[in-house]
Curated annotation (Swiss-Prot):
Gene3D superfamilies (alphabetical): DnaJ domain, Heat shock protein DnaJ, cysteine-rich domain, Urease metallochaperone UreE, N-terminal domain
Protein's organism: Mesorhizobium japonicum (strain LMG 29417 / CECT 9101 / MAFF 303099) (Mesorhizobium loti (strain MAFF 303099))
UniProt KW keywords: Chaperone, Cytoplasm, DNA replication, Metal-binding, Repeat, Stress response, Zinc, Zinc-finger
Domain J: 4-69
Cofactor note: Binds 2 Zn(2+) ions per monomer.
Gene that this polypeptide is encoded by: dnaJ
Listed name of the protein: Chaperone protein DnaJ
SMART domains: DnaJ (SM00271)
């Protein structure tokens, strides 16, 4: 027994168009076969969701369903009502709800023209490239307008003809009793025209697939996850329709030395125990390639931060520049020689509370705490 369409979508019987669309969108994204490859249960659920939405979004079909239930669409009822998802099924639903990849509707015109699909290209760049910016050359396989037929899909010297089934409307109406249902024309798939003599090069599609070389400008300061849109560089439209867009999704590779937080950079630099105690300096190479000296005052503690103003990342399309923060990591000596050990032991004997105020004060406070706790 078929499940109730309202229960399938998880909505109340009085749900409005907005609630239906929201419920369908959520469930369709969850159970779409592309997200669940090989899962036949999800594929079956996906078909149920589509059937339910296809019925309830149409006022006439919904009225019939509310009155007669599933019987309205069985043989002898409303012939062909909500059954199947060929013409006017999956494609029409997802064109209505989701549009193409980036949300632009793939629209048909009365002349059979369709907007081309948007394309996605993933690009990985280094932090240095994100810092300086670059112009990248990419090769993208995509459909382009057929030069043989100029995108019409018809054999040169011929023209598309008006569809004999829908007479150019792209829709056909089926009447059963007092019910009337309008569906996408199965002969022209809603285009209103058919091609009697298709172009031999593109097989009537009006476009062919080729690999194109494109130049992509990546501005300085670009961040990980940024999307760049190249208008009209996506798939060519069908039969002379407008092209889709190309979206470049950028990923900035992790750096060996620098971590990024917005426009600021962070770097951890190891220094020796003697440099931390006696003071000194070290040099760091910043992303612009320059050497910058960092002075270490005597008595520098582990984790101390030094700020190099204006040595971070440029802010995208602004004159501002972030800062570079250097954090010291005091390295404890290992594999000591006998003489080194003797010197450190001698240093320990000569040390006072003034040399290590934090550790000395900490242990003194800890001792006092437990002594006072024991007296209670």
């Amino acid at each position: 027994m078929k499940a109730d369409f309202y229960e399938t979508l998880g909505v109340q019987k009085g749900a409005d168009e907005k609630e239906l669309k929201s419920a369908f969108r959520k469930l369709a994204m969850q159970f779409h076969p592309d997200r669940n490859p090989g899962d036949h249960s999800c594929e079956h659920k996906f078909k149920e969701i589509n059937e339910a939405y296809e019925t309830l979004k149409d006022p006439q079909k919904r009225a019939a369903y509310d009155r007669f239930g599933h019987a309205a669409f069985e043989q002898g009822g409303m012939n062909g009502g909500a059954q199947g998802f060929g013409a006017g099924g999956f494609a029409d639903i997802f064109e209505d709800i989701f549009g193409d990849m980036m949300g632009g509707r793939q629209r048909r015109s009365s002349g059979g023209r369709e907007r081309g699909a948007d394309l996605r290209y993933n690009m990985e760049i280094s932090l240095e490239e994100a810092f300086a910016g670059k112009t990248a050359q990419i090769r993208v396989p995509a459909s382009i307008s057929c030069t043989e037929c100029s995108g019409s899909g018809a054999k040169p010297g011929t023209q598309p003809v008006t569809c004999s089934m829908c007479h150019g409307h792209g829709k056909v109406r089926a009447t059963q009793g007092f019910f009337s249902i309008e569906r996408t024309c199965p002969q022209c798939q809603g285009r209103g025209q058919t091609i009697k003599d298709p172009c031999p090069k593109c097989a009537g599609q009006g476009r062919v697939t080729e690999e194109r070389s494109l130049s992509v400008n990546i501005p300085a300061g670009i961040e990980d996850g940024t999307r760049i849109r190249l208008a009209n560089e996506g798939e060519a439209g069908l039969r002379g329709g407008p092209s889709g867009d190309l979206y470049i999704f950028l990923a900035v590779k992790p750096h060996e030395f620098f971590q990024r937080d917005g426009a600021d950079l962070y770097c951890k630099v190891p220094i020796s125990m003697t440099t931390a105690a006696l003071g000194g300096s070290f040099e760091v190479t910043t992303l612009d390639g320059t050497q910058t000296k960092v002075k270490v005052p005597e008595g520098t503690q582990n984790g101390r931060q030094f700020r190099l103003k204006g040595k971070g990342m440029p802010v995208l399309r602004q004159p501002n520049v972030g800062d570079l923060y250097i954090q010291t990591a005091v390295e404890t000596p290992q594999n000591l020689s006998r003489r080194q050990r003797e010197l450190l032991e001698e240093f320990e004997q000569l040390s006072s509370q003034d040399n290590s105020p934090q550790s000395s004060g900490f242990f003194a406070r800890m001792k006092d705490f437990f002594e006072s706790f024991g007296e209670r």
